Amino acid sequence: MVENSELRKAGLKVTLPRVKILQMLDSAEQRHMSAEDVYKALMESNEDVGLATVYRVLTQFEAAGLVVRHNFDGGHAVFELADGGHHDHMVDLDTNEVIEFTSPEIEALQHKIAEEHGFDLVD
């Protein structure tokens, strides 16, 4: 099972809650999910994982590099699987829809500005 190997590779013990949460994030139509979203989706699937466990596991996943945390909505944290590819986000403030995009022009401009100020971009 892919989830098991991903957890082991990240240095995490394979537990049922971790597997269920990783599966949920991987299969969800919504790419950016809050802990509450994950919890509700698990409940709708009749999975018995508590909200505190969801918060704890998402924090562990973030520390292990399996997910990335974003604070789009006034500090409200959402998580997405870390797929290794860099992309940026735009948020529609009326609908809270998150739009992902990549732009070589923006990336080049960021590197140019960083270089002009003597910085190296790390992310």
Swiss-Prot record:
Fe cation binds at residues 86, 88, 107. Its main location: cytoplasm. It is found in: Cytoplasm. GO terms for cellular component: cytosol. It comes from the Bacteria. GO terms for biological process: negative regulation of DNA-templated transcription; negative regulation of siderophore biosynthetic process. Keywords: Cytoplasm, DNA-binding, Iron, Metal-binding, Repressor, Transcription, Transcription regulation, Zinc. Residues 84-123 are annotated as: Dimerization. Pfam families: FUR (PF01475). Residues 1-83 are annotated as: DNA-binding. GO terms for molecular function: DNA-binding transcription factor activity; transcription cis-regulatory region binding; zinc ion binding. Zn(2+) binds at residues 32, 80, 89, 100. NCBIfam families: PRK09462.1. Homodimer. Belongs to the Fur family. Acts as a global negative controlling element, employing Fe(2+) as a cofactor to bind the operator of the repressed genes. This is Ferric uptake regulation protein. The gene is fur.
